[in-house]
Amino acid sequence: MTHQTHAYHMVNPSPWPLTGAMSALLLTSGLIMWFHFNSYTLLLLGLLTNLISSYQWWRDIVREGTYQGHHTKIVQKGLRYGMILFIISEVFFFLGFFWAFYHSSLAPTPELGGCWPPTGISPLNPLEVPLLNTSILLASGVSITWAHHSLMEGNRKQMLQALTITIALGLYFTALQAMEYYEASFTISDGVYGSTFFVATGFHGLHVIIGTTFLITCLVRQTLYHFTSNHHFGFEAAAWYWHFVDVVWLFLYVSIYWWGS
């Protein structure tokens, strides 16, 4: 191996971006097969390949950053910029859903009965499960901040406690959202209201599941002593992502559940 005279990380060739892209193709194709032909095979294959790719890719990053020392200050700076740009791209992703919702609701067409919610739709009560979900996510935002401060202060026990609480709240939110979908009187095929509601809240729910997966990974890494008070970007990125999920939910709650009902 040649001697490196700079602080940048020259990443070795990796198969995981390719297998990750293939799993994304299988997931989207699997969703189409599920929606149109009620077949789960391709979707389950996509989920399996996605989980394997994520695990292997995470393992490589942990090895490079924690054991091989490739994540220098300047590399961490680049990772921070990358995470910030990723979250900005996610903001615009959700902006499209809000645009679709407000475009449909601010000037309802005669086909919808000229009113919002459309004729025949019974919207969910914003003061029941949606309000509980809001309080759960806000509480999880507090607990993830507690975990971050505990980590920076070197308080390992409190960090593990706070992170476990955050994960439990994330799982509770997901369970309540699934129950709400199951009991809703309308479906994704009930016109523009059903499609905008389920696509916007469904993608947010997917982001909560992804964020919870990030936090579970951080919990495992913390139990293995991977993080220190000044070297923990993996956890920091997961915390940023969780706060983003919190903020998006507040906009969803105010727009779709409260104002939209």
Curated annotation (Swiss-Prot):
Major location category of this protein: mitochondrion
Assembly and binders: Component of the cytochrome c oxidase (complex IV, CIV), a multisubunit enzyme composed of 14 subunits. The complex is composed of a catalytic core of 3 subunits MT-CO1, MT-CO2 and MT-CO3, encoded in the mitochondrial DNA, and 11 supernumerary subunits COX4I, COX5A, COX5B, COX6A, COX6B, COX6C, COX7A, COX7B, COX7C, COX8 and NDUFA4, which are encoded in the nuclear genome.
Annotated membrane topology: Multi-pass membrane protein
Gene Ontology MF terms in the entry: cytochrome-c oxidase activity
Catalytic activity from the UniProt record: 4 Fe(II)-[cytochrome c] + O2 + 8 H(+)(in) = 4 Fe(III)-[cytochrome c] + 2 H2O + 4 H(+)(out)
InterPro entries: Cyt_c/ubiquinol_Oxase_su3 (IPR024791), Cyt_c_oxase_su3_dom (IPR033945), Cyt_c_oxidase-like_su3 (IPR000298), Cyt_c_oxidase_su3-like_sf (IPR035973), Cyt_c_oxidase_su3_a-hlx (IPR013833)
EC number(s) recorded for this UniProt protein: 7.1.1.9
Family statement drawn from the similarity comment of this UniProt entry: Belongs to the cytochrome c oxidase subunit 3 family.
Compartments, record wording: Mitochondrion inner membrane
Alphabetical list of PANTHER family matching this protein: CYTOCHROME C OXIDASE SUBUNIT 3, CYTOCHROME C OXIDASE SUBUNIT III
Keyword Transmembrane helix: yes
Transmembrane parts of this sequence: 16-34, 41-66, 73-105, 129-152, 156-183, 191-223, 233-256
Function field: Component of the cytochrome c oxidase, the last enzyme in the mitochondrial electron transport chain which drives oxidative phosphorylation. The respiratory chain contains 3 multisubunit complexes succinate dehydrogenase (complex II, CII), ubiquinol-cytochrome c oxidoreductase (cytochrome b-c1 complex, complex III, CIII) and cytochrome c oxidase (complex IV, CIV), that cooperate to transfer electrons derived from NADH and succinate to molecular oxygen, creating an electrochemical gradient over the inner membrane that drives transmembrane transport and the ATP synthase.
Topology Mitochondrial intermembrane: residue spans: 35-40, 106-128, 184-190, 257-261
A family per Pfam: COX3
GO cellular component, one term: mitochondrion
UniProt-recorded name of the protein: Cytochrome c oxidase subunit 3
PROSITE patterns cross-referenced by the UniProt entry: COX3
Gene source species: Ornithorhynchus anatinus
Gene Ontology biological process terms, A to Z: mitochondrial electron transport, cytochrome c to oxygen; respiratory chain complex IV assembly
Keywords: Membrane, Mitochondrion, Mitochondrion inner membrane, Translocase, Transmembrane, Transmembrane helix
Residue ranges, Mitochondrial matrix side: 1-15, 67-72, 153-155, 224-232
